[in-house]
A protein has these predicted regions:
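Structural recognition of the beta-strand scaffold that forms the well-ordered cores
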Residues: 101-105, 142-144, 216, 224-227, ...
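Conserved, well-ordered active-site substructure
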Residues: 113-137, 198-219, 223-256, 265-313
Length: 313
């Protein structure tokens, strides 16, 4: 596409140069941000733009998975029953953990809370280091992070359904165990909402524009795209539909994509590389890349149930 240019970094990451500010991250990641453009055209960034076109603000982090590690972050509530986690914020997580370079909100949850450390209920599977915090929701999808091999995006109910279908077959205990393995034995898994990119083809609802968070994987599983889109702010960013997010992921190189929790929960924090030469100051200091769209305090992250965090290997 002609809306942006690509170039390779010595680190093995890829930088996309939009008509807007950009900052290189450390450890195999690239941070790009821009605003403006025609939503219906996909990746169209412009510092000017025609005023009658919807405006978008978005940030993408392109990850070379040979150089970075993906880490699910969720904190079980002490003494709580299964299905509860303590709320946390991406920016505060980066501030407290200097080895990490990026963190995005992940699993949907209830209820909304206004401060960190409050019990919330993830909606869908969350598994961290083999400990399951919550159960799968069959209609939603999940990002699996296996100990070996590339990450995968699958339906949360697929493994359970396969296991149930084989339950009446004598001698198929091994098959049932294998079918159950992704959900039951996954070392790390973060549930999201829907698959919005399948085989490089966008899918999902076209109607509602909102703030969005999403992840996409390349066909060979070697690259991940993390995307955050600001929304619900006319004149600054109207957000994207689910299908539009799928198209953006495809344009950025993804083959399969997962929609994460969005709306007021959408938040992506990054840490600049100390040797970054873009912008003024702030090297190594975590910062938010999009302005969260929720009350009571606009611009402050909503505490969420889980994060997908990134650190160099």
């Amino acid at each position: 596409m002609s809306y942006f240019s690509r170039s390779s970094l010595a680190s093995g990451a890829q930088i996309l140069e939009f008509k807007g500010p950009e900052t290189q991250l450390s450890g195999g990641a690239t941070y790009v941000t821009g605003s403006g453009g025609n939503v219906s055209m996909g990746l169209t960034f412009s510092t000017g733009g025609r005023r009658h076109l919807p405006r978008i603000q978005a940030t993408a982090v392109i990850l070379d998975l040979a150089m970075v590690e993906l880490v699910p972050v969720a904190r079980p509530a002490p003494g709580a029953s299964e299905g509860e986690a303590l709320s946390l914020r991406p920016l505060l997580f980066l501030e407290a953990n200097p080895e990490y370079i990026a963190a995005i909100n992940a699993t949907p949850f209830e209820p909304n809370v206004v401060s960190v450390g409050k019990p919330v209920n993830p909606i869908g599977i969350v598994t961290v280091e083999g400990r399951g915090l919550s159960e799968p929701v069959g209609r939603y999808a999940v990002l699996y992070l296996p100990e070996s091999g590339p990450p995968r995006i699958e339906m949360q109910g697929a493994a359970r359904s396969a296991a149930e279908e084989g339950a009446g077959s004598d001698g198929d205990a091994r098959s049932r165990r294998e079918a159950e393995e992704p959900a039951a034995r996954a070392e790390n898994a973060l549930g999201g909402y829907f698959i919005i990119l399948e085989g490089g083809k966008p899918q999902g609802p076209r109607e509602l524009r909102s703030a969005r968070s999403a992840v996409g994987l390349s066909e060979d599983g070697r690259k991940m795209i993390i995307l955050a889109v600001a929304g619900d702010s006319p004149g600054k960013s109207v957000g994207l539909t689910a299908r539009e997010v799928g198209r953006w992921l495809a344009e950025l190189g993804a083959y399969r994509g997962l929609l994460l929790d969005g709306g007021g929960s959408s938040s992506l924090a990054v840490r600049r590389s100390p040797d970054a030469h873009f912008g003024s100051g702030g090297a190594g200091i975590p910062r938010m890349t999009i302005k969260p769209s929720w009350g009571p305090t606009l611009g402050v992250e909503r505490p969420v149930a889980s994060l997908l965090a990134v650190r160099p290997k």
